Structure formats: C-alpha cells, structure tokens
C-alpha cells in the first residue's frame, strides 16, 4: 500500500465493514439459514474456543443456535497491509455489542472478522475468511 493511498484504503475498509456488519447481523437474527453463504468455503469460525470449518459445518452450527437479537455498540475496521495478504484485498473488522439468545440472559460479546474481497462480474463481494466470537464477562 502506498502511503499516499492509505486514506483511500481506510475509506474502502470502513464502507465494506459498515455494509458487512448490517448484512451479517441482520442475517444472523432473521435469516440464519443463509448465513454460511457469507463465508468462504475454507473459512473457520472459532466460537468461544470451539472451531468450526467449512460451509456445511457452519450451516449446521448456526442452525443449532437459539434465536438471537444482536445489538452492535462498536465497530472498528482497518485494511490489512498488502505484505500480510499479498494480492488479496483484506479487511479486519472488530465488533463489540450485546446479544440475547432465546432462553438466555443478554450478554456482552466481541467478534473479529477477516474479510477478503471476491471479485464477481458486477461488483466486489466480501467473504469471511476467519471469524472469532467470544462472550465477554466483566471482572469485578
């Protein structure tokens, strides 16, 4: 990344992250059966220390989760430097918020995504390469 273009990369990352967050959590709460389509075929999800890989396994995992209501409080994003992911446009997205799963109390969570740009004939589609979800328990 040339330093002169860095603001452009940051702007693209922020727009991609904002759009992604809206799509991801809306899909998680309302159309979960479609959620695995947002992941690359080789993507890995680590959910509170438990790893799930591949779209079929991801679909099965998401279908097992109770209904949810996510509230996003913080979104941070940044482009990943070209040296870390050569020839691949990549964005790191960090989310903090609260979630209420049916039958459970509301909890704080943190979720980190690594998104990669997948070119299609009409536009760029961002796919999840890596996803790490953690419940956050506050120390007293």
Curated annotation (Swiss-Prot):
Source organism superkingdom: Eukaryota
Cross-referenced InterPro entries: NTF2 (IPR045875), NTF2-like_dom_sf (IPR032710), NTF2_dom (IPR002075), Nuclear_transport_factor_2_euk (IPR018222)
Domain (NTF2) ranges: 16-135
A Gene Ontology BP annotation from the UniProt entry: poly(A)+ mRNA export from nucleus
Keywords, sorted A to Z: Acetylation, Cytoplasm, mRNA transport, Nucleus, Protein transport, Transport
Subcellular location: Nucleus; Nucleus speckle; Cytoplasm
Pfam families in alphabetical order: NTF2
Primary location: nucleus
Residues found modified as N-acetylalanine: 2
PANTHER family: NUCLEAR TRANSPORT FACTOR 2
Role noted for this protein: Stimulator of protein export for NES-containing proteins. Also plays a role in the nuclear export of U1 snRNA, tRNA, and mRNA. The NXF1-NXT1 heterodimer is involved in the export of HSP70 mRNA in conjunction with ALYREF/THOC4 and THOC5.
Name of the protein in its database record: NTF2-related export protein 1
């Amino acid at each position: 990344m040339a330093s002169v273009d860095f603001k452009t990369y940051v702007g693209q990352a922020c727009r991609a992250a904002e759009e992604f967050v809206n799509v991801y959590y809306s899909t998680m709460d309302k159309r979960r059966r479609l959620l695995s389509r947002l992941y690359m075929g080789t993507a890995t999800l680590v959910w509170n220390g438990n790893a799930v890989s591949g779209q079929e396994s991801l679909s099965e995992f998401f279908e097992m989760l109770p209904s949810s209501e996510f509230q996003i409080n913080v979104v941070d994003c940044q482009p990943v430097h070209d040296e870390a992911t050569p020839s691949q446009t990549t964005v790191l997205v960090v989310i903090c918020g609260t979630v209420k799963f049916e039958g459970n109390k509301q909890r704080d969570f943190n979720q980190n995504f690594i998104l990669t740009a997948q070119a299609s004939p009409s536009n760029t589609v961002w796919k999840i390469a890596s996803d790490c979800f953690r419940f956050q328990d506050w120390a007293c």
